[in-house]
Amino acid sequence: MIFIYAIIALLITFILVPILIPTLKRMKFGQSIREEGPQSHMKKTGTPTMGGLTFLISIIISSIIAIIFVDHSNPIILLLFVTIGFGLIGFIDDYIIVVKKNNQGLTSKQKFLAQIIIAVIFFVLSDVFHLVHFTTDLHIPFVNFDIPLSFAYVIFIVFWQVGFSNAVNLTDGLDGLATGLSIIGFAMYAVMSYMLDSPAIGIFCIIMIFALLGFLPYNLNPAKVFMGDTGSLALGGIFATISIMLNQELSLILIGFVFVVETLSVMLQVASYKLTKKRIFKMSPIHHHFELSGWGEWKVVTVFWTVGLITGLIGLWIGVH
């Protein structure tokens, strides 16, 4: 059955994308490009965005089928809730930008508040209604030590889900970068899930992998469509949720290492400029720094994928030992 879920997810995305692209073009749902960014990106102006809708629809349909046939499917139900919740936030943000022609989209406060609400509801569904059981201790790899967080774990969940949701969003600035890194990351968590005896989470990870594989050919350079916040916010929220449900939260620092570095580069750039009026990088997130240093877009993407694969394998090894 796992093979069937994978094929369904792959085919739905692969079929939906070429249908959605001309529709988005006709509706003029095109991406705006930052003028201060790399000049090579200006040709991307008008490329259809909100393409994340395709793999989110694929994930939802495939997951519902899995819920019907898989025993102990509560983890999939929770992951589906997070997918829809964070995806909806991203969709509203994209809609305001491309339809209302408001480049800001949702304000930071609006987006942050909505993400907090989704994270808190996730905790309530899992802890209060017992849809799935996970410890409120923060597991520290290698030292066989757990930090009991108790109620403070709610704060950690909010920080983790909101943080990684925005981290993937920041990384989605080069063709295929976030999509490829996400495929690698979900592959690591698929293996980890089965090794930690959490097959339902493993099935969801496999659905994620194949839904994204159906999207990747259209998202590679030169991209025919971007996933938009619709896709990137959902992917980050899902990553954080999987690490929480497996009680392997800190594994995400390595499995999502590139996402972490991209986010830190933005934070360091902002802090440095505010404190010293000097920039550390030529431009942030850091993938733009490498572009402005003379790297081609495809080189940056493949190097970052390679780094993601190496650190992901290390994160997987740590997570199962």
Swiss-Prot record:
Pathway as given in its UniProt record: Cell wall biogenesis; peptidoglycan biosynthesis
EC number: 2.7.8.13
Organism of origin: Staphylococcus epidermidis (strain ATCC 12228 / FDA PCI 1200)
Topological category with respect to the lipid bilayer: Multi-pass membrane protein
InterPro entries: Glycosyl_transferase_4, PNAcMuramoyl-5peptid_Trfase, PNAcMuramoyl-5peptid_Trfase_CS
Transmembrane segments: 1-21, 50-70, 76-96, 112-132, 140-160, 176-196, 200-220, 225-245, 250-270, 300-320
Compartment(s): Cell membrane
Molecular functions per Gene Ontology: metal ion binding; phospho-N-acetylmuramoyl-pentapeptide-transferase activity
EC category name: transferase
Domain of life: Bacteria
Family classification: Belongs to the glycosyltransferase 4 family. MraY subfamily.
Cofactor: Mg(2+)
Keyword Zinc annotated: no
Function: Catalyzes the initial step of the lipid cycle reactions in the biosynthesis of the cell wall peptidoglycan: transfers peptidoglycan precursor phospho-MurNAc-pentapeptide from UDP-MurNAc-pentapeptide onto the lipid carrier undecaprenyl phosphate, yielding undecaprenyl-pyrophosphoryl-MurNAc-pentapeptide, known as lipid I.
Gene Ontology cellular-component terms listed: plasma membrane
GO biological process: cell division; cell wall organization; peptidoglycan biosynthetic process; regulation of cell shape
Name of this chain's protein: Phospho-N-acetylmuramoyl-pentapeptide-transferase
